[in-house]
């Protein structure tokens, strides 16, 4: 029954509107209230269509972080708006909404624009990296990746964001 309600809600989003709603308005109509398992830990959102990759990255992070998962950019955008995680790890090539579009939308929304986004992808050419950074990505790691590199880079992104927040106060 819950899945049917969600599917009907998603269909409602796709109906034409007289005015263009913001992403936040669309998501507020569809989301139900949930709580994170451990609100004392920093929260990481993993967006990847490959369940094995999501599972592996989650296994690296679960001791230190609360981990939320999404299988495509659209679902990831919804979860980012709902939970406002401390960082996002996102694949580039995914169905529904790719990682570049997801990153661009995250950085355009006031509510999520401050969240560090790490692109974790098989796309490793400099031109592809440039495209990722132009979409607003804060970091770019190519698959296959070194797990220690991912963990250190993620920790640095979160720590740098915390320092900015301390320096500028609650303005960011």
How does the language model describe each region?
Residues 145-154, 158, 166:
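C-terminal output helix
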Residues 55-62:
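Charged docking surfaces used in two-component/phosphorelay signaling
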Residues 65-71, 79:
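Short hydrophobic/Thr-rich beta-strand motif most characteristic of the beta2 strand and flanking loop
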Residues 94:
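Receiver (REC) domain active-site loop signature in two-component systems and cognate sites
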Residues 83-89:
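Active-site beta3 strand of CheY-like receiver
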């Amino acid at each position: 029954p819950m899945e049917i309600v969600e599917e009907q809600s998603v269909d409602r989003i796709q109906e034409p509107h007289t005015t263009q709603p913001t992403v936040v308005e669309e998501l507020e109509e569809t989301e139900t209230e949930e709580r994170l398992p451990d609100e004392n830990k920093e929260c990481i959102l993993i967006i990847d269509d490959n369940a094995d990759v999501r599972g592996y990255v989650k296994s690296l992070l679960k001791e230190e972080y609360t981990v939320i998962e999404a299988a495509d950019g659209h679902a990831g955008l919804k979860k980012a708006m709902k939970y406002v995680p401390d960082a996002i790890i996102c694949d580039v090539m995914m169905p529904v909404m790719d990682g570049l579009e997801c990153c661009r939308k995250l950085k355009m929304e006031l509510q999520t624009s401050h969240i560090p986004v790490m692109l974790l992808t098989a796309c490793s050419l400099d031109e592809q990296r440039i495209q990722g950074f132009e979409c607003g990505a804060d970091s770019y790691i190519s698959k296959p990746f070194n797990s220690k590199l991912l963990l250190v880079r993620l920790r640095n992104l979160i720590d740098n964001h915390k320092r900015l927040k301390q320096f500028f106060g609650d303005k960011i």
